[in-house]
């Protein structure tokens, strides 16, 4: 299997309740000494208007949004097939939503009191 790369969108088996859906890889590739895990932001077509839903129109996905509140880490074995890749601007938009959800500083800023 191809190693998933940050910025790629894969069709993923997230289990019975979450079903098979597209998801964006946001973790770095696992090294030889690491567990074969990948962290993803699921894509949903059932949006709720949350500020943590990031709409990124791409031709290989139905209209919807990446749900930063739905972060999940799964084994590579749950990846079904690669659907495509976001460009750097699109990836940065989703990363911004993830940082907001996790309360992390914006890119280029440092946290602190």
Where are these regions (language model features)?
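Conserved functional hotspots at enzyme active or ligand-binding sites that engage polyanionic ligands
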Residues: 1-113
């Amino acid at each position: 299997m191809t190693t998933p790369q940050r910025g790629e969108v894969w069709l993923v088996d997230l289990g019975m309740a979450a079903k098979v859906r597209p998801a964006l890889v946001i973790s770095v590739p696992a090294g030889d000494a690491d567990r074969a895990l990948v962290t993803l932001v699921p894509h949903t077509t059932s949006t709720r208007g949350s500020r943590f839903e990031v709409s990124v129109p791409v031709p290989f996905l139905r209209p919807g949004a990446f749900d930063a509140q739905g972060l999940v880490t799964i084994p590579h074995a749950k990846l079904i097939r690669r659907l495509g890749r976001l460009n750097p601007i699109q990836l940065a938009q989703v990363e911004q939503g993830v940082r907001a959800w996790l309360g992390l500083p914006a890119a280029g800023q440092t946290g602190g009191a």
